[in-house]
Amino acid sequence: MKTLIIGEVVEGNLSSGALEIIAKSQELGLEFEVATVGTEESPNIGSESFKNTYLKCNETQLSLGSVANTLKTMVDEQSISLIMAPSTYVGRDLIAFLSVDFSSSQVSNVINFSIEEGNVITSNSINGGESEYNSKITSDKKFLLIRPK
């Protein structure tokens, strides 16, 4: 399943939330690449184990619309079906933009996920972590907001 992981730069490095998603994607053997968003000129986000595209945004603007447009183009051109981001302000904004662009709902509060016969199965936390439920996502484009551990 072709996958896009949306990451962020934190203090010059790829965020821990993105690294968690990358590790899980590698564990599942997903074909993925990372799009990293940040305001820095030369962040330390390289890796030999995955492709990374750095999207520099303007730190004086609140809107991530231009970044979302670039991500939409990536998803379209590469036939990506699974898009994931850490549950941060940037991750939530970008997943929201993309889910509207592709008319597909997002699943939030994901604490774990698996792939079964081309579908994504998520475990989600609700009620402050007191309850957990599972979702089976069958849509063409699957949008997940992953809660950090």
Segments (PLM) and residue ranges:
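N-terminal glycine-rich FAD/FM-binding segment characteristic of electron-transfer flavoproteins
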Residues: 1-149
